[in-house]
Regions:
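Beta-strand-rich binding/interaction modules
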Residues: 67-73, 421-422, 435-438, 443-509
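Amphipathic alpha-helical substructures
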Residues: 365-455
Length: 524
């Protein structure tokens, strides 16, 4: 499947309404890897809470490339039907709160989306890894594959004993059976299906620890193949600094009792923020920290996307926009506001390919990442620094280990700012496309008491008729300067300013708070 096909239309056909009648509480995923055959054997148990006792059908997302050998419902064998992407169990009305479904299956996993399940090879040895986002966990294990149905998970991976097998959460046990070795990993915090991952390869391990502000410790691991190991360790060493900045900005690391780690995989597009175990593509491990922003971005996802998950894929910007802006916030915290401006300047664009909420072309375009970051930057200007940073911490605290929608974020933002932000959210998130595009001219004339400057601003964009926004204007005088803020509310606006001295130069939005272009027509 091409990435351009991963949109809300596809996802709407993949998930069914009846899935909301159930709530997954726990996955027990046992996978035996057969790399020479590029096949797997699976044994999965799912504990589900029944929300609607009248629902007769349990629909699990599970691609039909897998041969299902057995399905048990509460330890009784049941019949099931298959479609291309789903497995449906018809059940009698159950007067119970929870049910347990067990499935045994085998087959060759499909490679969809960003790859989903990969039998790869590096340096003459097998390398196996997964990447499920957004809806391809079900290419290799049965699940309810929607982001807001988080559950706890036990993941056991069996492979040849010469391989190290990795997953989310905390390592519980390693057991040997003949030439096979099984690694058992366990999550103590809820996880979305798309964030569950396995890696198995010839990994070497580097360990360090982070000591939090409250003196708690987080185990940090770097897993890389031998020829990239030293480079990976060098790229990984600054995670203590990144963690401290994000802890100060957002709150404590959300998976403190498990770990944070990076694992090398052979993905060509960059990195993937699997919960507690980010995958880093081989080409992005340099030993010279060339891709520091990417590593910072993936760590930020542990707060934004993993701990605070999206309620639906329509809300994907809450993952990617927040993590992209976190890159800029890191550089601001460590190097000053100019560093933030430099970071954001590299993330500008026209963004004319849809709205930020429910992007209609591609869930993973620059619109979602970069415009999402700019919208947070403009929101910061709109509500003020103090309120903005309190908002981030409280948004995280309120929704950690849960899921939030864009409307949830709007509601808490209005609560903390004590402002009606419907206009802001409509023009930048729900309805508006593109950016503010303007042309302007100005004239300055003397008066009895100084000078009067008239600035004429005209909005030109097609994606949204009239943006309303605060606009800083900087006046440069011979020996001084000043900044005044005006609120633009019309498509064609005239701003009149009286000053004691003649402005030598005028700059609109001098500190780059707006996702906007200002093209001067004439000046004096």
């Amino acid at each position: 499947m091409n990435l351009k096909d991963i949109d809300e239309k596809f996802i709407a056909n993949y998930n069914v309404k009846g899935q909301k009648s159930f709530d997954v509480l726990h996955y027990s995923i046992n996978i035996e890897l057969l790399p020479d055959e590029k096949r797997i054997k699976g044994n999965v148990a799912i504990i589900l809470k029944v929300n609607n006792l009248d629902e007769q059908y349990l629909t699990l997302n599970f691609y039909d490339n897998m041969k299902v050998n057995e399905v048990l419902l509460n330890d009784k064998q049941v019949e099931f039907t298959r479609s291309k992407t789903n497995l449906v169990i018809k059940q009698d009305r159950l007067n119970r709160d929870t049910i347990v479904v067990k499935l045994k299956y085998e087959g060759e996993p499909k490679r969809l989306g960003f790859g989903s399940f990969n039998f790869d090879e590096m340096n003459g040895k097998k390398l196996i890894y997964t990447l499920n986002e957004p809806v391809f966990a079900s290419t290799w294990y049965p699940c309810i594959d929607i982001p807001d149905d988080k559950a706890l998970a036990d993941i056991s991976i069996t492979n040849d004993s010469s391989y190290v097998s990795l997953s989310n959460g905390k390592l519980i046990a390693i057991t040997n059976s003949g030439s096979k070795r099984t690694y058992h990993w366990k999550t103590f915090y809820p996880i979305s299906t798309y964030l569950i991952a396995i890696y198995s390869g010839d990994y070497k391990t580097h360990y360090q620890k982070y000591v939090s502000i409250s003196k708690d410790t987080v185990d940090l691991f770097c897993y890389a193949l031998p020829d990239k190991f030293e480079d990976a360790v060098r790229d990984f060493t600054d995670h203590n600094k990144y963690l401290r900045v994000f802890e100060e900005l957002f709150g404590f690391y959300p998976f403190i009792n498990e770990k944070y780690s990076i694992a090398q995989f052979n993905w060509v597009y960059g990195a993937m923020e699997h919960q507690t175990i980010t995958g880093i593509g081989t080409d992005y491990i340099t030993g010279r920290k060339f891709f520091q922003d990417m590593i910072i971005h993936e760590l930020a996802h542990q707060w934004w996307g993993n701990a605070v998950g999206p309620k639906s894929w329509e809300d994907i910007w809450l993952n990617e926009g927040f993590s992209t802006y976190s890159e800029a916030l890191y550089w601001e915290k460590t190097s000053g506001f100019d560093a933030l401006k430099t970071t954001l300047a590299a993330k500008t664009g026209t963004f004319k390919n849809g709205t930020l909420y429910n992007p209609d072309r591609n869930l993973f375009s620059s619109l979602v990442y970069d415009k999402g970051a700019w919208v947070l930057h403009m929101l910061r200007k709109e509500i003020g620094d103090s309120t903005f940073f309190k908002l981030l911490r409280n948004y995280y605290d309120r929704f950690k280990y849960k899921n939030a929608s864009t409307r949830d974020f709007q509601k808490i933002t209005e609560e903390f700012s004590k402002k009606n932000l419907s206009r802001f959210f409509d023009q930048w998130i729900f309805k508006g496309q593109g950016i503010i595009e303007t042309e302007y001219d100005y004239q300055t004339n003397p008066t009895d008491e100084g000078f009067i400057t008239k600035i004429n601003i005209k909005q030109l964009q097609n994606g949204y008729d009239i943006y309303k926004f605060p606009l800083d204007i900087k006046f440069i005088y011979e020996n001084d300067s000043s900044i005044q803020t005006f609120y633009v509310t019309k498509k064609e606006e005239t701003i009149i300013i009286e000053t004691k001295y003649k402005p030598l130069e005028i700059y609109l939005d001098p500190d780059k708070w707006l996702l906007a272009t200002f093209t001067i027509i004439t000046d004096n």
